Amino acid sequence: SSAASDVYKRQLDQTQDFFMDGGKNVRPASDENVRNNIAGIGRIIQEANCDVQFLQEVDKSSKRSYFVDQTASLSSLIGGTNAFAVNYSSQYVPFPLPTIGKVQSGLLTLSSFGALKAERIALTGTYTWPVRVAQLKRCLLVERVPLEGSDKELVLINLHLEAYDDGDAKQIQTEELLKLLTTEYEKGNYCIAGGDFNQMFSEVDATKYPLIDSSYWQAGTLSSDILPEGWRFAVDDSAPTCRLLNQPYSGDRAKTQFYVIDGFIVSPNVEVEAVHVIETDFQYTDHNPVKLEAVLKK
């Protein structure tokens, strides 16, 4: 079986920057811009030809994406089942100027397998009231796929961990993720978790995508030491998985801050055959998809 994490962040394409990353903009220039980017992302999804897609930051009804229902556009692409878990829902986000306004956004999992059930599991956040009212409520989207001739399940977890915190929330959320994964594995289930960890991986060569300016957002590092024996990260650093949105992307790689923060965790009974970043040159979004090909061990 194969699974892919296609990670999309507000469909901010090559021409965009974003205020939280040091840029100026809150949203793309027009709804046409949003629709073009969604169409481009759709083509990438279809070309990747995966059984499962983990998508993050998919808007259902948000001012920032001109109220285009992206879940509807993307859900029809590969057939099978789809599940959506909201992690950002606010009637009005009062910052910056112009304001973000209404947001309804979350995680979308597309599966050609047909899942038994899908469940939203809340993760611990560290924002306090009133700030948390206008912040993301991080979660995991967990799907269970029955396996023929077995009482075990394939447990698929779509994730997007905290971004702009001091590191505490990410650490807590990572621990919560690992606790869930190990519990499922101990039942004999097969586990694949994937998405945007907002952290670099210790397997990645840190000199490949160094911090080029000390004022830029710096990702913490996820050490493989935190994984129980036999578990592994499935990541690839042949291309970056994300760019900083402090400025539009000119294609000048020397002046662009890159990261490898997207990938997978797999249980010991899942054999990784290949994992690679699909290089899209950030044409439609500020993340590159990561494709995992894996086999469930008998």
Question: What is each model feature region?
Answer:
Residues 9-10, 59-62, 88-92, 115-116, ...:
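Solvent-exposed loop/turn segments at secondary-structure junctions
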Residues 24-30, 58-60, 124-133, 160-168:
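Surface-exposed cleft-lining segments at the edges of enzyme active sites
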Residues 1-95, 99-104, 298:
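N-terminal, active-site-proximal structural segment of metallo-dependent hydrolase catalytic domains
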Residues 82-89, 118-124, 275-278:
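Conserved S-adenosyl-L-methionine
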Residues 144, 168, 179-192, 198-298:
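Metal-dependent phosphoester-hydrolase catalytic domains
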Residues 91, 95-154:
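A well-ordered secondary-structure block
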Residues 2-6, 37-67, 110, 143, ...:
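Active-site beta-strand/loop signature of hydrolases that rely on acidic residues for catalysis
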Residues 75-78, 102-118, 145-146, 255-271, ...:
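Conserved beta strand-loop-helix elements of the APE1-like EEP
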